[in-house]
Amino acid sequence: MTDSIAAPAAATDKLVPFRHIFLTGGSGYVGRNLIRHLVARGVAVTALARSDASAKIVEALGAVAFRGDLFESTLAAGMAGCNALIHAAADTNHGPATEKQRRVNEEGTRVVLDAARTAGIAKVIHLSTESVLATGRPLVNVDETMPLPPKPAGGYSRTKAEAERIALAANGPDFSVVVLRPRFIWGRDDTTALPTLLEAVRSGKFAWISGGNYLTSTTHVANLCHAVELALGHGRGGEVYFISDAEPVTFRAMVSALIETQGFAVPEKTVPRFVVRTVATIGDVMAKISGGRVVPPLTLQAYATSAVEVTFDIGKAQRELCYTPVISREEGLAELRSAQHR
């Protein structure tokens, strides 16, 4: 689908002060929606594209493709004429830690920021994740003052936390870097999380963890795009902001609603939390001692994402970015149902 799900732009929209933006991760779920959102507001977007297929995707959405990857030697030249960078590219694998993930998330962030500075870019939005705080224990209404944990849940949390440190360390008087942390990104045109969820339902592998009756924050992709726009205009360099749909919801209610929008019956099977935690812990150990040759069915990283409460306070984004969701959870679910029946 190529139509935008972001909030419509006003005729005299002044929230985006930057007229030419360089985007990494443009062919991904969030990246595609960011291109639609920004192009609709008259912003020129140059998107990094690793392949011909990725280039076709971003060009079809109205961006100019710059062929290469995060480590492209001509990256700074590709950013010429841009005055802002949105760094959305990441290896989001929740499996065992890998060197590839470390290189993409950590070194890739450093290289992209260095290129942006060389190109004279003034503002950077670094898309992070609430998973930088994940350890496997509940995160209950936390805010940005919570420190990064010394022992994160897994490779994704560890490398994204280090990417945050790299991004924030790069902030300076002439190079403003703002970090956004969304949680549970969802919405129309999802080609990653929702299809994976539905495949688990189809195959009979889906099960609730302790019934799924724990709270979670969520972030509709249109709300994330809106937050990026606000952060470009109002975000303070060197600061981190949580972004969500505002009110939390139980994990079971949210996932059930997503499944139902696609015409599937919601499974009832449930597994005790301690069993899932044990399987995840053993899986991590087996992957480590086998040097990655054993691929576990579950990791502590995946457990930390889906088995415990994860909610946070978005008061800082509301105060400093003037952020408020532009689409409600009910509207987003209705949009998914409508798209399914077209």
Q: What are the functions of these language-model segments?
A:
Residues T2-A11, H20, F312-E320, T324-R342:
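Amphipathic terminal alpha-helices
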Residues A53-E59, A63-E107, V111, A115, ...:
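NAD(P)H-binding glycine-rich loop region in Rossmannoid oxidoreductase-like domains
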Residues L230-P296, I314, E330-R337:
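Mid/C-terminal beta-alpha module of Rossmann-like enzyme folds, strongest
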Residues I21-R41:
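N-terminal Rossmann NAD(P)H-binding glycine-rich loop of SDR-like oxidoreductase domains
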Residues T24, G187, I209-Y214, Y241-P248, ...:
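Glycine-rich Rossmann NAD(P)(H)-binding loop
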Residues E107, V111-G155:
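Conserved Rossmann-fold NAD(P)-dependent oxidoreductase catalytic core, especially the SDR/UDP-sugar
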